[in-house]
Amino acid sequence: MNIQSIETYQVRLPLKTPFVTSYGRLEEKAFDLFVITDEQGNQGFGELVAFEQPDYVQETLVTERFIIQQHLIPLLLTEAIEQPQEVSTIFEEVKGHWMGKAALETAIWDLYAKRQQKSLTEFFGPTRRKIPVGISLGIQEDLPQLLKQVQLAVEKGYQRVKLKIRPGYDVEPVALIRQHFPNLPLMVDANSAYTLADLPQLQRLDHYQLAMIEQPFAADDFLDHAQLQRELKTRICLDENIRSLKDCQVALALGSCRSINLKIPRVGGIHEALKIAAFCQENDLLVWLGGMFESGVGRALNLQFASQPTFSFPGDISATERYFYEDIITEPFILEQGTMTVPQGLGIGVTLSQTNLLKYSQYQKIM
């Protein structure tokens, strides 16, 4: 394929309600949409989902914009691309910056599938048309209000609830939820809020039949996670420190976890994500798909990727209305009896809403 143009929309979508984690508060989701057009007029869409603050991982929206325009796009234009798997090799000389790489790499995958007149799901092997999904709930100090949120999620049919926790907000809300919902698939996510000194408190969580405890310790730690996993019956899940297949291999070798939260942007794109999914399946690591408050473009990709049979555990792929009043695609994603339908159109299978793009974004033609 020959790239004819690259455009970007800098988008800001307000959230319906603020989302609070152990490291911050999110009131709107800022992201960039990249549109890559080939010589045939096909367009591939990729979403740059890095947050504005470096409080989740190192990348930010501003740093990745710079890396994309000054380094990755020039590399992408050095030669004609035949297969989307080539992109990760082309980008190898740039160290790190996985989310910037993923924004362009996923756009190339979408473009490639459209050139082949195929859905992107056809490149993922056997897939399902509908997949079970879960919901993530932010820190809610008002515990009666938290119970209402859980009740609403259950009534809507979400098949798993994840609760964000931090020191001082952990055992009490978990115990309350478990008291009212004894059979609910429930997990917690600490976003690196704890240290090994908090072991006694984390051991208390072992009594509530949690599906897993996600990322209790630092994003660069494997050793303390391994010690914690030896101490707990509950499965430990790693998120922030899984940036590559090599990180999964290290985690397995050390016994740092028994589950992986896989986020396509966090590992540099689809090619690396496919290798990680295969590795987890081969080594009995429970792998599931996480989210980054994506718009409909990233959400479509997540649904397609999670349609692989490997992803049996419900991921963080909520309905559009969970977070946003409006989206940048024409058809919102809807929850139906705890499942969501995987888009089957060409590429990622969604159409952009030009009206909403004009309403919520600033346009820039890069080339």
From Swiss-Prot:
* Keywords per UniProt: Isomerase, Lyase, Magnesium, Menaquinone biosynthesis, Metal-binding
Indicate whether Isomerase appears among the record's keywords: yes
**Pfam families with a match to the protein in the record:** MR_MLE_C, MR_MLE_N
CDD domains tied to this protein: NAAAR
Gene Ontology molecular function terms on file: isomerase activity; magnesium ion binding; O-succinylbenzoate synthase activity
Instruction: Name the pathway it acts in.
Output: Quinol/quinone metabolism; 1,4-dihydroxy-2-naphthoate biosynthesis; 1,4-dihydroxy-2-naphthoate from chorismate: step 4/7; Quinol/quinone metabolism; menaquinone biosynthesis
Active-site residues, as the UniProt record annotates them: 164, 263
Q: Which reaction does it catalyse?
A: (1R,6R)-6-hydroxy-2-succinyl-cyclohexa-2,4-diene-1-carboxylate = 2-succinylbenzoate + H2O
**Positions contributing to Mg(2+) binding:** 189, 214, 239
Q: Which GO terms describe its biological process?
A: menaquinone biosynthetic process
The protein's required cofactor(s) are namely: a divalent metal cation
Q: What is its EC number?
A: 4.2.1.113, 5.1.1.-
What the protein does comes down to:
Converts 2-succinyl-6-hydroxy-2,4-cyclohexadiene-1-carboxylate (SHCHC) to 2-succinylbenzoate (OSB). Also acts as a N-succinylamino acid racemase (NSAR) that catalyzes the racemization of N-succinyl-L-phenylglycine. Since the gene is encoded in a menaquinone synthesis operon, OSB synthase is probably the physiological activity. A pathway that requires NSAR activity has not been identified in this species, so whether NSAR is also a biological activity is unknown.
Question: Which HAMAP family does this chain map to?
Answer: MenC_2
Which PANTHER family would you find in this protein's record? O-SUCCINYLBENZOATE SYNTHASE, O-SUCCINYLBENZOATE SYNTHASE-RELATED
- Tell me, how does this one assemble? Homodimer.
Family statement: Belongs to the mandelate racemase/muconate lactonizing enzyme family. MenC type 2 subfamily.
Q: What protein name is recorded for this chain? A: o-succinylbenzoate synthase
Protein's gene: menC
